[in-house]
């Protein structure tokens, strides 16, 4: 049995859950478009189709960051987790292979940061927690911006600082983390190879 096939059979339940969620989302899109067509609301249908197209483009940008583990993590996160909604935006083309740090280290740092936020979420929330992760390339650095709307323990700041410190100069906080009663914001930078 090929390695890829073995992986699929070993993780069948998880893969089926992801595929079912993806199929469900696409069927919802088709139902909305069908309803607009039946009601003769063509402009609303066009606007909705534009929204679906932008979502597909966003997913394509995530898939092209040249870090398959992180792309898969981002693209499957919401299908596998219910406690926090994660939205990822890639503002400019990002190529993780151009970083000074290894791709696996970048994956570990970003995914662990999200895991820390997830772990430190307060159990009682006013609204469902929503995290926007924005990646972009500028001036020979890649930036990762985390913007959480939701209540999270203040302990997360210290753990994120330790996580960055453990990567010995391969990552740094751009500014102080901002923690309020309703959210948390941090921006990290990662130097590219010269």
Residue ranges and their predicted role:
Residues 154-181:
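ATP phosphate-binding glycine-rich loop and adjacent ATP-lid/helix-beta elements
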Residues 27-63:
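DHp/HisKA dimerization-phosphotransfer hairpin of two-component histidine kinases
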Residues 1-15:
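Conserved signal-transmission helix
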Residues 176-194:
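C-terminal edge-of-domain segments
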Residues 18, 23-39, 102-134, 162-163:
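Conserved ATP-binding N-box helix of the HATPase_c
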Residues 93, 122-156, 186:
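Conserved beta-strand-loop-beta-strand hairpin that lines the nucleotide-binding pocket
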Residues 66-84:
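Short beta-to-alpha transition helix within the HATPase_c
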Residues 89-96:
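Conserved catalytic submotifs in the C-terminal HATPase_c
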């Amino acid at each position: 049995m090929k390695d890829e096939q073995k992986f699929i059979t070993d993780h069948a339940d998880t893969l089926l859950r992801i595929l079912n969620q993806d199929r469900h989302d696409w069927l919802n899109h088709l139902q909305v478009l069908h309803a607009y067509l039946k009601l003769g609301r063509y402009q609303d249908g066009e606007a909705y189709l534009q929204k679906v197209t932008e979502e597909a483009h966003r997913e394509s940008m995530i898939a092209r960051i040249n870090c398959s583990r992180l792309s898969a993590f981002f693209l499957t996160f919401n299908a596998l987790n219910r406690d926090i909604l994660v939205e990822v935006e890639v503002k400019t083309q990002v190529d993780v292979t151009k970083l000074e740090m290894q791709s696996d280290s970048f994956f570990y740092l970003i995914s662990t940061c999200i895991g820390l936020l997830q772990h430190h979420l307060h159990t009682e929330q006013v609204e469902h927690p929503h995290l926007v992760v924005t990646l972009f390339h500028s001036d020979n650095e890649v930036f990762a911006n985390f913007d959480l709307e939701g209540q999270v323990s203040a302990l997360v700041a210290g753990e994120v600082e330790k996580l960055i410190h453990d990567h010995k100069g391969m990552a740094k906080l751009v500014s102080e983390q901002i923690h309020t009663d309703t959210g948390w914001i941090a921006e990290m930078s990662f130097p590219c190879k010269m």
